[in-house]
UniProtKB/Swiss-Prot annotation:
This is Beta-galactosidase BgaB. The lineage of its organism: Bacteria, Bacillati, Bacillota, Bacilli, Lactobacillales. The active site is at E148, E302. Capable of hydrolyzing the chromogen 5-bromo-4-chloro-3-indolyl-beta-D-galactopyranoside (X-Gal) at low temperatures. pNP-beta-galactoside, pNP-beta-fucoside and pNP-beta-galacturonide are also hydrolyzed, but not pNP-beta-galactosidase, pNP-alpha-galactoside, pNP-beta-mannoside, pNP-beta-arabanoside, pNP-beta-xyloside, pNP-beta-glucuronide nor pNP-betacellobioside at 20 degrees Celsius. It comes from Carnobacterium maltaromaticum (Carnobacterium piscicola). GO terms for cellular component: beta-galactosidase complex. GO terms for molecular function: beta-galactosidase activity; metal ion binding. It is an enzyme of class 3 (hydrolase).
Length: 668
């Protein structure tokens, strides 16, 4: 498996778009930029299999040899991300179909149904040919399977999917009556007597059965995962030891990242923060989430050197922004930074997506200078490879809950899983408190504090695990509309939140969501804090009121609560707080959980813009100091160390310039 010794630096390379002269110039420029790793052949299917009858590997042979001769490692893709025109012409049944029954034709990308057996047969044939030919090539560092599963096709309603869905359901439930019970089909006369009576949840007159919808989302994720596993198996027939991976997309809803990570040897994701955001917290969150999928270092497989091409306004990254955000990923556990793509395309749908080498081909351009600077710096940081990121706080992240939470017919259609996550994650990031994300099946005992945010769907196993964790002394925070249903979207009876009611010392009688734009307030101590989106009628059953609602029939009633359970404590948020309220509540919980920021560095400014994290190994701590402010800031080291980016020894007060970074190596 992967024996990585250097931080990877490079990007997607698509030499099939360019002349021989430009390709040779690319080798020179890659060396100048300290590129040591590229992804190759991701969209190469039509090039290496121009017709069904035969393969032509001559160009790919040449490229692998050329890259290897120039000291550049290769993440070689099997090329299955975009089926060629000849395949679609011969087998139009491989095309994905919308819920309205419209096939999506060739001329874009990802135009395939993941469950279609014909498509899969051609995928396996191609993958086997690629793996057989290049399994022993010395330049291959990693195998790259497909590309961004479900990025564009997150649903398919073709006949193949319908047949596969019925088989999937039969495997899961065994008996049709079991499905009827789990799907609550007595409601609206939806009961089934035969498996072939079940259709995909296509267009319907009104609200669909949410259990039906939820299983369909599980099915789609599973179909893409089994496709990945089939492609991986084809590679493993010829290559036993080289790692196999694909590029995930961080906060992407439609495939279960934890399930994919179990099958991947290395985890990577494609990071595209919005340049108009000073601190793009969703991307920061996604770095921590991606690392957490395997609790190991990860790779940023794609990011833009500057602008992308697919937003309504595709702003350029300001000077230094790309560098700072790259270090944000490194600070949170990345062992490589890659771009899409090396050279900006001359034509095609992504020609205005920035590249490491721009249309102007000017090596004195700002973008290329920043690319060279980052590559030069990263070449000096190889000792970071494999270092750990440790956290005392865990946030539960569950794709199945995400799917269930955002289905139709909820008390509020405005509950957004990622926004709820982001609101609280932001507080930990600003307080310089490290966070892991965990699957509900993972052990909770490694953490002092566990958050279960908008955890609408809760299994009996997770509920029991939470009870054991708190009884043993853990601290647990959950938020409104959590613990409501089981894995079949059936409500726990006896008062909300049924799965957590005992450990919280409360029950919720009724939800009272607020319309968009309406604000309210709670009283927390002697201070009033703004709330929105949600209120509810909370009854205490042993819990203590921390804050109260201040308006209407809920005036004086609990909004935030605390409860001692066993040796631990639980906290409940019955409303959505603005940032200052979240900050107050989280700081209180951290103090009671005895969780503090890194103790090696003291930040002097009360309103500091410094983000501080630590990676470590058995002998050293590596303190990352990223200044997101517009002015220089000073921090105070508790003991002296080495500044890795310039090699100098530092102690006492250290200044970090605006939009800049320092990495301090401290001996343990």
């Amino acid at each position: 498996m992967l024996q990585q010794k250097k931080l990877f630096y490079g990007g997607d390379y698509n030499p099939e778009q360019w002349s021989k002269a430009i390709i040779l110039e690319d080798m020179r420029l890659m060396k100048k930029a300290n590129v040591n790793y590229v992804s190759l052949n991701i969209f190469g299917w039509a090039s290496i299999q121009p017709t069904e009858e035969g393969f032509d590997f001559s160009f790919l042979d040449e490229m692998l040899d050329l890259l290897w001769e120039n000291g550049i490692g290769i993440d070689l893709a099997n090329g299955t991300a975009s089926p060629p025109a000849w395949l679609v012409k011969k087998h139009p049944e491989i095309l994905p179909v919308t819920s309205q029954g419209t096939p999506l034709v060739h001329g874009s990308r990802q135009h395939y149904c993941p469950s279609n057996k014909v498509y899969r047969s051609y995928v396996i044939r191609l993958t086997e040919e690629v793996a057989k030919r290049y399994a022993t090539h010395p330049g291959i560092v990693m195998w790259h399977v497909n590309n961004e599963y479900t990025c564009h096709i997150s649903e398919c309603y073709c006949e193949s999917c319908e047949k596969s869905f019925r088989q999937w359901l039969q495997m899961k439930y065994k008996k049709i009556n079991t499905l009827n019970e789990c799907w609550s089909t007595k409601f609206w006369s939806q009961s089934y007597s035969q498996w072939d009576e079940i259709f995909l949840p296509k267009e319907m007159p009104t609200f669909k059965n949410p259990a039906h919808q939820l299983d369909y989302k599980r099915f789609i994720s599973d179909q893409n995962l089994t496709l990945f596993k089939a492609e991986k198996k084809a590679i493993r027939s010829y290559s036993k030891d080289i790692p196999v991976m694909t590029n995930l997309m961080g906060l992407h809803k439609h495939v279960d990242g934890f399930a994919f990570a179990e099958e991947m040897d290395v985890v990577g994701w494609d990071s595209y923060p919005n340049p108009f955001e000073e601190k793009p917290y969703p991307q920061f969150l996604a770095n921590d989430l991606t690392r957490s999928l395997k609790k190991k270092p990860f790779l940023v497989m794609e990011q833009a050197p500057s602008a992308v091409n697919w937003r309504r306004a595709n702003g350029a990254k300001s000077p230094g922004q790309m560098r700072l955000w790259s270090y944000e990923a490194l600070a949170h556990g990345a062992d490589g930074i890659l771009f899409f793509q090396w050279r900006q395309s001359q034509g095609g749908a992504e020609k205005f997506h920035s590249g490491m080498v721009s249309h102007n081909q000017d090596t004195n351009s700002r973008i290329f200078k920043e690319v060279v600077q980052l590559g030069t710096e990263m070449s000096q940081l190889d000792e970071l490879v494999g270092t750990n990121y440790n956290a005392e706080v865990a946030i539960v992240f569950d794709w199945e809950n995400w799917w269930a939470l955002e289905l139709d017919a909820k008390p509020s259609g405005e509950i957004n899983y990622i926004k709820q996550m982001r609101d609280l994650y932001t507080i930990f990031h600003e307080l310089n408190i490290g966070v892991d994300f965990i699957h509900p099946k993972e052990d909770l005992s490694n953490y002092k504090l566990v958050l279960s945010i908008a955890q609408y769907l809760v299994t009996d196993d997770f509920s029991a695990k939470v009870k054991r964790y708190i009884k043993a002394g853990g601290h647990f925070l959950t938020t409104f509309f959590s613990g409501i249903v089981d894995e079949y979207d059936r409500v726990y009876l006896g008062g909300y939140p049924g799965a957590f009611k005992e450990v919280l010392g409360i029950y919720v009688e009724e939800f009272d969501p607020m319309p968009i734009g309406r604000k309210s307030q709670i009283k927390y101590g002697e201070t009033y804090y703004t709330t929105e989106l949600w209120k509810e009628v909370i009854h205490l059953q042993g819990a203590e009121t921390i804050a109260t609602f201040t308006e209407g029939y809920l005036m004086g009633q609990p909004a935030l609560t605390k409860f001692g359970y066993g040796k631990g404590k639980t906290y409940y948020m019955g409303t959505k707080l603005a940032k200052d309220g979240n900050m107050k509540f989280i700081q209180t919980i951290l103090a009671e959980s005895k969780i503090q920021p890194l103790n090696q560095v003291e930040i002097e400014s009360e309103n500091s813009k410094i983000s501080m994290t630590c990676r470590s190994n058995s002998s050293h701590d590596y303190i990352f100091l990223l200044n997101y402010g517009q002015t220089s800031e000073k921090v105070k080291l508790k003991k002296g160390g080495q500044s890795l980016l310039d090699g100098s020894m530092v102690e006492g007060e250290v200044s970090v310039k605006a939009n800049d970074v320092k990495i301090i190596k401290l001996t343990k």
